[in-house]
Curated annotation (Swiss-Prot):
Origin organism lineage: Eukaryota, Metazoa, Chordata, Craniata, Vertebrata
Record's compositionally biased regions (Acidic residues): 17-37, 72-90, 293-303, 1357-1368, 1378-1387
Entry's localization field: Nucleus; Chromosome
Protein name, UniProt field: Chromodomain-helicase-DNA-binding protein 5
Family the UniProt entry places it in: Belongs to the SNF2/RAD54 helicase family.
Chain positions of motif DEAH box: 849-852
GO BP: cerebral cortex neuron differentiation; chromatin remodeling; negative regulation of cell population proliferation; negative regulation of transcription by RNA polymerase II; positive regulation of signal transduction by p53 class mediator; regulation of cell differentiation; sperm DNA condensation
Substrates-to-products reaction catalysed: ATP + H2O = ADP + phosphate + H(+)
Post-translational modification (record): Methylated at Gln-1392 by N6AMT1.
Notes concerning its domains: The PHD domains mediate specific binding to histone H3 unmethylated at 'Lys-4' and may preferentially recruit the protein to transcriptionally inactive genes. The chromo domains mediate specific binding to histone H3 trimethylated at 'Lys-27' (H3K27me3) and may be required in neuron differentiation for proper gene regulation.
InterPro entries in the record: CHD_C2, CHD_II_SANT-like, CHD_N, Chromo-like_dom_sf, Chromo/chromo_shadow_dom, Chromo_domain, DEXHc_CHD5, DNA/RNA_helicase_DEAH_CS
Length: 1946
């Protein structure tokens, strides 16, 4: 690893090299000097090291080595060179250097040597006479005529400029500023002198800065004076046989290490090889110079922490490279510090630039690869001469022998030992290990060495003894005693100047680690040295170092959990315990881990000695270990005897204890297990009056009801009736089950095996109960990870070794293998995961605890368990009817599938009967299968439980945070889409946290005062939370009265705060949350339940602490924050109210008043009613998730009052609020707020203090005493006992809130209430606060205070409302409208309805509240007051007429069953129905998101029908003003014909009218088709609501294609090809039904199709439908929509005063419709039978009849005189018997064709609107060319057929050829057509176009403010009112991403 530049060791060398380079380069031109800057790069460049080719002069003796034996003679020239090389290079040596040089180079080198020698002699002379004083910087600058820089260095400068690099960076710009043209060489010299002077004047001489300065000053001196050759002071005479150990002069961690490859090359000999080509980086860019010294320091520290093996790793790499005979040339890069040891220039000869350059082997030139001519792509192999040398004829020559020897000498001197001490990471004289690269200071060894040892020396690492095995984990560490010190001799070799003096030579203490060995038990734990751990478990050691404090050993951890006092007493009494505690327990080893739980298996070794596989208590199976027979472990012999006894019991005599072990076992013979009888000895149908003998033997006593349960279970078993034991929680279902299984075993009925599946958290409790109540059972707990389960399968399932294949993968068990266990305990998950093994065993009985896991027959658990081979099933559940009857049926279906297998039949039985009857019927049905007892039935004298809701105030700090959260999230709350559901949930969670405690927010936690031990200051902790203030008072009284408390919270962080609170108050406590696992959990429960336990409180998380825990010793439960799911809270407080409880249980549920918590409590209660009152399939809420509306409602609760406090506070201070207080209606449940308002009203004005106090809850001593009074009446549950206490209404403590008089009452069985929503609530409430906050933020960010514009937000919202009202398409019908919206509904334009209600009626309707969303009346479900029959009638009406029109309430659309409903109720139900229709989700779901039953509603079919009816209605309205109302106008009375078209449209109450909030004038006769289409579009806005997805998707575009089609008629014949091409394009655009035959696309070639739709439509953005010019053109164009014959006919009739008729469907020729019309009209016109032959006219009136009478009401349409024309074509068939059937079939078939054409027309319109085009090169376009070819061929040979018929044989032959050609062309076309669907461009789904999900599009649609696209175009729309109404932004109204599929049935 390279260190940064500028370290102390490198600076002298670095500086000297710079100066020498300066000398060499000063002879060259100035351009070459730029390379100097690169010797001081700002950040190191890590590049491969190369051995320099040319030797440079030595600058420093620093890197010099101690000489070996033969190195002490006087130095020859070669040796001198060698020394110089080793000195100057340090660790730069690399084996990749060249071994041979050219002759010329050799000569040059010799000359240089002589010069150097001469210079060296001069320097020696100087040495003798003393050194000359170097010139000062002032002298130098004066000498060179430069301006000196006068800068006075401050004390700070001496502190900061601690190295040469920093100094240079600081001073160089100052010098350059005064002397802009100073040469680089002079700059460097001046800087060196300045640095020397700066260092000499440094007042901090002892600091590292001074040391660095001295080093560089020394380097500066070497510019002119070379140092004398350093000879090692410790020279040993050559004759001595004993050599000293190897030493070296290390350079510290900042220096590169030498490469190891030298040794390898030496070993291999000097065979020829291709030398590496030299590369060099010159002129490194200046950008790299800007880094600070911080980076250098960071790299230094990185180096210190780097892997200790880095040098050897690098060396190995180098060695590997050296082994190749031929190697590629390596690119040589510049080194950071040492510079480049060659004479080559560091810039390109051609471009004079630096970079990666290739060096010539025969001259100093260098080149870029790209600058050579020709250019080289890569470096050439071998030696390379540059173009200049080749031109001159200079060639490379090998070196002669003496130079090779010189190279060899270098190699011998090469060393790969570390350059720094391994202990202190510092340089200096180092002792090198002979076996590894490690180096050490003598004083760093432990114990330190006084002198260098003789002979070979091995470091501590090489002499470290190996470990006895693999370490599994580190348990503890400690300091050892230091080794005895050596007698300190003379100090070691001299250290560098500036280094601290060596430490005294005394040993230092080392760490020792207490470790657990892998594969060995905790009995074998032992201590190991730190070095052993570091060497053999490096990663584990480093991880431990990182996670633990390595200065102080960890405190002793008594794993047993005993308190110090108890353990001291026990140690005094029990010396064995004291010994174990000292050896094991204090290091965190639990006593249980050293106790044998069970012996699993045995084996014999080669000597015949026996070994046992032992499972240890409280440790998983993968920690099992093999132990020898003679080990001294308590109770080992007893367990061995039990092991052999169990083998004998299960396998018989063969499995006895081996004979040689019998003696040891004799004395334990009496403990042998009793064998169960082979045949039954007791009749299971006979009742036990008292508990049987085998239960007495356990020492336990069953309660009478438990004995009754045992009798019932045994009887059911005998009868073969599978059962559900459904006793209420806390009545001991576990004990009854275990005793039942034990009775089967002990009485000889069954030997097992039994499978028990239970929640993972309760399995420990099951184990304990089995141990207590069934001691003879061999119970195996099958849980844990893969390794543990693998051990269990191999050792616990069978006695045979090969019964199951080993390994982690699960395999089946062999058949007829003896099972080892009696009972297998496992979790739900493993039932499914390890199905292979568990499913292969035949189980005598299955027990499923918490069996409501089986309520869904689609769950994997249900399906897998159903496949097991089970003789008898027993299910345990405390909540058998948790949700609904369907779930109960699934339980019964699992039990007895042969009896309960028809879900529909089962549910029908319970469909229409009242709740009481359902209960009775259920009782009869479940009688044989289910036993359920309640605590109230069983324990008549069991203390009752009382639950109180305790409302708590927010503290001031909480209020601040509550407001802040709401204000900060204003945008999310106020987003017009209602906000993202996830973001609303996040806001709610933040508010819940705030209600609990503000310290749950990191900001508050950081600011909170903290004690020295890290816990929060108690007083501020309490004051910050209203709940804690109350809790403090309550706990004080509860403690004084001797009660014990359970405190539940959902949040584990809240439990942390409660811990701090209890510590502050001085209460002892226990805690369980999700992170505390089985063993620790049970210990905590045992400690709390122990007699005389000191623990006063038990902190539990609601979910983790709610299952399988018995804490009956506590009698007070405080639910600190309610859970989302009320069942979890019930489970929680049932921990205390259970068997063993002898005191009354008080349950206090803390609820923060007027906050989200209070609202959540109400919603949770309502949800509970929903899931339990409704015993009806599909109504149970499957998901506990809140709807977005519920979330919004919860968030609003109490906010009005909270923010009103601010305003009142300002009023009391005489201030005026800046914004008016919005009049926000109080949400339901806000009775408290209402009460507070009343109180305000009665308060005298000005008495604000009293006003404030009146609405705040105060808890004084009297209130607390009353709250804790246990003589209050128990919660009255008697009325609700039918549903087993699930609806126990919460009793609200009336005294808590002073104003509250009454208790909440349940009026009727309201399951769910739909609530009105004010969409502008957040706008009114938070806008001002939000803007204020944004302003504060801006000011704090330094942007200055802005002047706020005064805005009246009420005005703004009214303005918004005005323009939104014009866009009724965007108003939300998905939630019930507010009062204002209701008024919009009622204020209808005059004349639209003949039955207008009076104002009084409307007002009474409006004031009457809506029925609840879900309610139960007489056993039946009502949705918004609609019963099942009415809901069915409404659906039928939708399927008949499509969307209800605006005036549906006053038309025949309102069928008889719906006429009893008020208009408000009807509209509310329409809104709800449409919301459900637009709700994404599977049709298979039982309910919608809000819990309303689906009742088999198929969203697909309903949307399809609505869409088709909408298209039909729109098409009829398009032509209605032209065609009138009557199909046969000559038969119509005169009065009817004279009506205005507008009246004609609306006069029939059954025909839906165009509805718009603003009154529209009736369409005049001249209105364009497009305008009509737009008016038709508004038809879908009935009842102020959006159309659902289908109709939205179908009716988006104007009918511009109709007009375009008319224009087509005027195209000249030569444009026919273009028309065909466009038609083909339309084929590709169309999104029509895949069912329609594709071949029809090419048939109607005479049919006009749209040509260039883009011309008429333009881009959608530029489309302006109400442009007056367009309107002028359109009436004429409208008449061109028909065919030519039709046009002519229409004109003729118009002139003669006859009626006009106009009708067309622009299907683009994709259906047969126009072909049929042409043929039919030709026949009708030619025969004159306009009425009798069915054609276009009849199709129009068929559609008009469908609009009036509904879908497929053929008979009604035929009987209507308005549509008499439809009967005319069939008059001739009237005498036939199947006349009606034939007529209806024809109408149905014809309507299907029209349907298809309408859909295609709509799709074409949309394609044109979106400007969809097909690439002309697309293969599909080839179809057009083929068609032209076919037509051309056919037309040009038409005459042939006549000639052929006339007998012309040549013509006949030609005709045959032509026909063959046509056939081939047509077959090719057919092949192309089959490929079309996959190639055509499709209109992407709306969701894809908008890049929004279906749900988010729906959110936009359901919001009043509309989506952003509307808002963006609002200004344009204000100018065009018609466009506003009829053209809402198209994409956002197409929420159905599967639009194409929905059109398929047509």
């Amino acid at each position: 690893m390279r260190g940064p530049l500028g370290t102390e060791e490198e600076l002298p060398r670095l500086f000297a090299e710079e100066m020498e380079n300066e000398e060499e380069m000063s002879e060259e031109e100035d351009g070459g000097l730029e390379g100097f800057e690169d010797f001081f790069p700002a950040e190191p460049v890590s590049l491969p090291k190369k051995k320099p080719k040319k030797l440079k002069e030595s600058k420093s003796s620093k890197g010099k080595r101690k000489k070996k034996e033969g190195s002490n003679d006087e130095m020859s020239d070669n040796e001198e060179d060698l020394e110089e090389k080793s000195e100057s290079e340090g660790s730069d040596y690399s084996p990749t250097k060249k071994k041979k040089k050219k002759l010329k180079e050799k000569k040059e080198k010799k000359e240089k040597k002589e010069k150097r020698k001469k210079r060296g002699e001069d320097e020696d002379d100087n040495d003798d006479g003393g050194l000359k004083e170097p010139k000062s910087s002032g002298q130098l600058m004066a000498e060179w005529g430069l301006d000196d820089v006068d800068y006075l260095f401050s004390e700070d400068d001496y502190h900061t400029l601690t190295n040469y690099k920093a100094f240079s960076q600081f001073l160089r710009p100052l010098i350059a500023k005064k002397n802009p043209k100073i040469p680089m060489s002079k700059m460097m010299t001046v800087l060196g002198a300045k640095w020397r002077e700066f260092s000499a004047n440094n007042p901090f001489k002892g600091s590292s800065a001074a040391a660095a300065a001295a080093a560089v000053a020394a380097a500066v001196e070497t510019v002119t004076i070379a140092p004398p050759l350093a000879i090692s002071p410790q020279q040993v005479p050559q004759t001595l046989p004993i050599r000293k150990a190897k030493t070296k002069e290390g350079k510290g961690p900042g220096v590169r290490k030498k490469n190891k490859g030298a040794k390898d090359s030496k070993k291999k000999g000097r065979g020829k090889r291709v030398a590496g080509l030299k590369f060099r980086f010159g002129g490194i860019s200046k950008r790299k110079k800007g880094s600070s010294s911080e980076e250098d320091e960071r790299e230094d520290s990185d180096l210190d922490n780097a892997s200790i093996h880095s040098s050897s790793v690098r060396s190995e790499c180098s060695a590997a490279l050296g082994k190749k005979n031929k190697r590629r040339r390596k690119k040589k890069r510049i080194d950071d510090g040492d510079g480049y040891e060659t004479d080559h220039q560091d810039y390109c000869e051609v471009c004079q630039q630096g970079g990666e350059i290739i060096l010539c082997d025969t001259c100093p030139r260098a080149y870029h690869l790209v600058c050579l001519d020709p250019e080289l792509e890569k470096a050439p192999e071998g030696k390379w001469s540059c173009p200049h040398c080749e031109k001159e004829g200079i060639q490379w020559e090998p070196k002669d022998d003496d130079e090779e020897e010189e190279e060899g000498g270098c190699e011998e001197e090469e060393d790969d030992h570390m350059e720094f001490c391994r202990v202190c990471k510092d340089g200096g004289e180092l002792l090198c290990c002979d076996a590894c690269p490690s180096s050490y200071h003598l004083h760093c060894l432990n114990p330190p060495l006084p002198e260098i040892p003789n002979g070979e020396w091995l470091c501590p690492r090489c002499t470290c003894p190996p470990l006895k095995g693999k370490v599994q984990r580190i348990l503890h560490w400690r300091w050892t005693e230091p080794p005895a010190p050596f007698v300190v001799g003379l100090p070691g070799p001299e250290v560098e100047p500036g280094m601290p003096p060596p430490r005294p030579l005394e040993g230092i203490p080392e760490r020792e680690f207490f470790v657990k060995w892998a594969g060995l038990s905790y009995w074998h734990c032992s201590w190991v040295k730190e070095l052993q751990l570091e060497l053999y478990h490096t990663v584990m050691y480093r991880n431990y170092q990182r996670k633990n404090d390595m200065d102080e050993p960890p405190p002793f951890d008594y794993g047993s959990g005993d308190e110090d006092g108890k353990s001291e007493k026990r140690k005094n009494k029990d010396p064995l315990y004291a010994k174990m505690e000292e050896r094991f327990y204090r290091y965190g080893i639990k006593p249980e881990w050293m106790m044998v739980h069970r012996i699993l298996n045995h084996s014999f070794d080669k000597k015949g000695d026996i070994h046992y596989l032992i499972k240890w208590k409280d440790l998983p199976y993968d920690q099992c270990t093999w132990e020898i027979d003679e080990i001294d472990i308590p109770y080992y012999d007893n367990l061995k005897q039990a092991y052999w006894g169990h083998r004998e019991l299960m396998l018989g005599e063969d499995a006895r204890l081996p004979k040689r072990l019998v003696k040891k076992g004799k004395k334990l013979k009496d403990d042998k297990q009793e064998k169960p009888p082979d045949t039954p000895i007791v009749d299971p149908t006979v009742k036990f009056d008292k508990q049987p003998w085998y239960i007495d033997a356990t020492g336990g006593t069953l309660h009478p009801y438990q004995l009754e349960g045992l009798n019932w279970l045994r009887f059911s078993w005998a009868q073969g009736t599978d059962t559900i034991l459904a006793d209420e929680m806390g009545l001991g279902k576990t004990v009854q089950t275990i005793v039942f299984l034990y009775s089967l075993y002990k009485e000889g009925h069954s030997k097992g095996p039994y499978l028990v599946s239970a929640p993972l958290s309760t399995i420990i409790n099951w184990e304990r109960e089995f141990e207590m109540w069934a001691p003879d059972f061999y119970v195996v707990t099958y849980t844990g990870d893969k390794e543990s389960r693998s051990v269990i399968r191999e050792n616990e399932f069978s006695f045979e070794d090969n019964a199951i294949r080993g390994g982690k993968k699960v395999f089946r068990m062999k058949k007829e293998v003896q099972i080892k266990f009696h009972v297998l305990l496992t979790s739900y998950e493993l039932i499914t995961i390890d199905q292979a093994i568990l499913g292969s065993i035949e189980w005598a009985c299955l027990v499923v605890d918490e069996a409501h896991r089986l309520k869904n027959n689609q769950s994997k658990f249900f399906r897998v368990l159903n496949s097991y081979k089970i003789d008898y099933k027993l299910l345990l559940t405390g909540t058998p009817l948790q949700n609904n009857l369907e779930e109960l049926f699934h339980l019964l279906n699992f039990l007895t599938p042969e009896r309960f297998n028809n879900l529909e039949g089962f549910l029908e039985e319970f469909a229409d009967i009242s709740k009481e009857d359902q209960i009775k019927k259920l009782h009869d049905l479940l009688g044989p299968h289910m036993l359920r007892r309640l605590k109230a039935d069983v324990f008549k004298n069991m203390p009752a439980k009382t639950e109180l809701i305790v409302r708590v105030e927010l503290s001031q700090m909480q209020k601040k945070y509550y407001k802040f959260i709401l204000t900060r999230n204003f945008e999310a709350l106020n987003s017009k889409g209602g906000g993202n559901q996830v973001s609303l949930l996040n806001i709610m969670m933040d508010l819940k946290k705030c209600c609990n405690h503000p310290y749950l927010f990191p900001v508050a936690a950081v600011e909170a005062p903290v004690l020295p031990n890290g816990s929060y200051d108690g007083s501020s902790l309490v004051k910050s939370s209203g709940k804690l203030m109350l809790l403090q008072k309550m706990l004080k009284k509860l403690r004084d009265e001797g009660h014990r408390v359970l405190i539940f919270s959902q949040m584990t962080k809240m439990l942390d705060l409660l811990e701090d609170f209890l510590e502050y108050e001085g209460y002892k406590y226990e805690r369980i949350d999700g992170g505390i696992t089985g063993g620790l959990r049970q210990e905590a429960i045992d400690r709390f339940n122990a007699p005389g336990a000191q623990q006063f409180c038990f902190l539990l998380s609601t979910r983790a602490g709610g299952l399988g825990i018995n804490l009956a010793t506590a009698d007070t439960v405080i639910i600190y924050d309610s859970d989302w799911n009320p069942h979890n809270d019930i489970q929680a407080f049932s921990r205390a109210h259970r068997i063993g409880q002898n005191k009354k249980v008080m349950i206090y549920r803390f609820v923060t008043r007027a906050s989200v918590e209070e609202r959540i409590t109400q919603v949770a209660k309502r949800k509970m009613m929903l899931t339990h009152l409704v015993v009806r399939p599909g109504l149970g809420s499957k998901s506990g998730s809140m709807t977005k509306q519920e979330l919004d409602d919860i968030l609003k609760f109490g906010t009005e009052e909270l923010f009103k406090d601010d305003v009142e506070g300002m009023m009391s201070q005489g201030q005026r609020p800046t914004t008016p207080i919005p009049d926000i209606q109080s949400t339901k449940g806000g009775s408290l707020t209402a009460g507070a308002k009343k109180k305000h009203g009665s308060t005298p004005p000005g008495d604000n203090k009293d006003v404030e106090d009146s609405s705040v809850i105060h808890y004084d001593d009297a209130a607390i005493s009353k709250l804790l009074d246990r003589n209050q009446d128990a919660t009255d549950d008697t009325e609700l006992q039918n549903m087993n206490e699930y609806l126990s209404s919460f009793k609200v403590a009336q005294y808590v809130v002073r104003e509250e008089d009454g208790v909440e009452e349940v009026e009727r069985e309201v399951i769910k209430q739909e609530e009105n929503v004010d969409p502008d609530y957040w706008e009114k409430l938070l806008r001002h606060h939000y803007e204020q906050q944004q302003e504060d933020l801006a000011r704090n960010l330094g942007k200055g205070k802005r002047i706020r514009k005064q805005v009246n937000y009420n005005d703004a919202s009214q303005e918004d409302q005005e323009w939104q009202d014009e866009l009724s398409d965007n108003q939300s019908e998905y939630s019930i409208g507010s009062e204002d919206e209701d008024e919009d509904f009622e204020e209808r334009p005059e004349g639209q309805s003949g039955r207008r209600q009076s104002r009084r009626q409307l007002k009474s309707d409006r004031d009457k509240p809506l029925p609840p969303l879900l309610a139960r009346v007489g056993g039946n479900i009502e949705v918004l007051g609609f019963n099942a029959r009415q809901r069915k009638a409404f659906l039928n009406a939708i399927m008949r007429w499509g969307m209800p029109p605006q005036d549906a309430f006053n038309s025949h659309w309102l069928v008889r069953d719906l006429r009893g409903k008020s208009e408000k109720e009807f509209r509310a139900y329409v809104s709800l129905f449409m919301r459900h229709l637009c709700e994404p989700g599977a049709d298979g779901a039982e309910t919608f998101a809000d819990g309303v039953p689906r009742e088999g509603l198929s969203r697909q079919h309903v949307l399809t029908r609505i869409g088709v009816m909408s298209l039909v209605r729109k098409k009829v309205q398009e032509f209605e003003h032209v065609n009138g109302k009557y199909s046969t106008p000559d038969l119509v009375p005169e009065g009817a014909e004279g009506k205005k078209p507008g009246e004609v449209i609306s006069s029939d109450p059954n025909t839906p009218v165009p509805a718009s909030p603003a009154q529209l004038p009736p369409a005049p006769l001249g209105l364009t088709d497009k305008m009509e289409a737009q008016l038709g579009y508004t038809d879908e806005k009935e009842s102020g609501m959006q159309k659902p997805k289908k109709s939205l998707e179908i009716q988006t575009l104007p009918t511009a294609l109709d007009r375009v089609e008319g224009e087509d008629k005027h195209q000249s014949s030569d444009s026919k090809d273009r028309a065909r091409e466009e038609r083909t394009e339309e084929v590709e655009k169309a999104q029509g039904s895949p069912e329609q035959p594709l071949k029809e696309e090419v048939l109607p070639d005479k049919e006009p199709i749209p040509d260039k739709p883009e011309l008429s439509l333009g881009h959608s953005g530029d489309f302006r439908p109400d442009d007056p010019k367009t309107e002028e053109k359109e009436p004429g164009e409208t008449q061109q929509n028909g065919d030519r014959e039709e046009d002519e006919e229409g004109k003729k009739e118009d002139k003669n005063g006859k009626f006009k008729f106009m009708f067309n469907i622009a299907d683009g020729g994709f259906t047969e419709l126009h072909t049929l019309w042409q043929n039919e009209e030709r026949a009708a016109v030619s025969s004159g039978k306009i009425y009798e032959i069915w054609h276009r006219r009849h199709d129009y009136w068929l559609l008009a009849g469908i609009v009036t009478h509904g879908y497929a009401r053929w008979q009604d349409i035929q009987n209507d005189p308005r549509y008499m024309i439809l009967n005319e074509p069939f008059k001739s068939e009237i005498h036939k018997g199947n006349y009606l059937e034939m007529k209806n079939k024809f109408l149905a078939r014809r309507f299907k064709l029209l349907e298809q054409a309408l859909v295609i027309e709509e799709q074409l319109r949309r394609a044109a609107y979106l400007n969809m085009t097909q690439d002309p090169n697309h293969p599909a376009m080839a179809l057009n060319a083929r068609l032209a070819e076919v037509e051309c061929l056919a037309e040009s040979h038409q005459h042939l057929s006549k000639e052929s018929l006339a007998g012309n044989k040549p013509a006949n032959a030609v005709l045959h050829k032509v026909l063959n050609q046509l056939e081939e062309l047509l077959s090719d076309m057919k092949a192309d057509v089959t490929r079309l669907p996959s190639m055509l461009s499709r209109i992407p789904p709306v969701a894809a176009r908008l890049q929004m999900s279906e749900r988010s599009i729906l959110s936009r649609l359901t919001n009043r403010a509309g989506d952003p696209t509307i808002q963006q175009t609002s200004s344009r729309r204000r100018d065009f009112p018609l466009f506003q109404r009829s053209f809402p932004a198209e994409p956002s109204h197409l929420p159905n991403p599967r639009g194409r599929e929905k059109l398929q049935p047509f």
